[in-house]
Amino acid sequence: MARKLMARKTPPLVGLDTVQLRVETIWLTSQMDLFVLTDKGEPRITASRASASRVATFGMTSVWLKNSCF
């Protein structure tokens, strides 16, 4: 099943640098069962057991994390 998820094409995340992407990967993997994958250096997201609302929450969280100071 993991291979099917990895092969699935999804839209790239826009405007995130590597550090922000790593922070999101750690947080989202533990909170929402979302996994960020890289395809040719472009960050991409695929969902495992995640509903459409969780994917929408990921998009809003991405913007929030990008605008936050750590």
From Swiss-Prot:
Organism superkingdom = Viruses
The coiled-coil segments of this chain are none
Q: Which UniProt keywords apply?
A: Host cytoplasm, Host nucleus, Host-virus interaction, Phosphoprotein
> Is tRNA-binding a UniProt keyword of this protein?
no
Q: Name one GO cellular component term.
A: host cell nucleus
Please state where this protein is localized: Host cytoplasm; Host nucleus
UniProt modification remark? Phosphorylated by host PKC. Phosphorylation alters the stability and may also have an impact on the subcellular location.
Keyword Ion transport included in the entry's annotation = no
Q: What function does this protein fulfil? A: Alters the structure of the nuclear envelope. Involved in the perinuclear-nuclear localization of the capsid protein VP1 during virion assembly and maturation. May contribute to viral genome transcription and translation of viral late proteins. Plays an important role in the release of progeny virions from infected cells and in viral propagation.
What assembly does the database describe for this protein? Interacts with VP1. Interacts with Large T antigen. Interacts with small t antigen.
Name of the protein this chain belongs to:
Squirrel monkey agnoprotein
Q: What taxonomic classification does the UniProt entry list for its organism?
A: Viruses, Monodnaviria, Shotokuvirae, Cossaviricota, Papovaviricetes
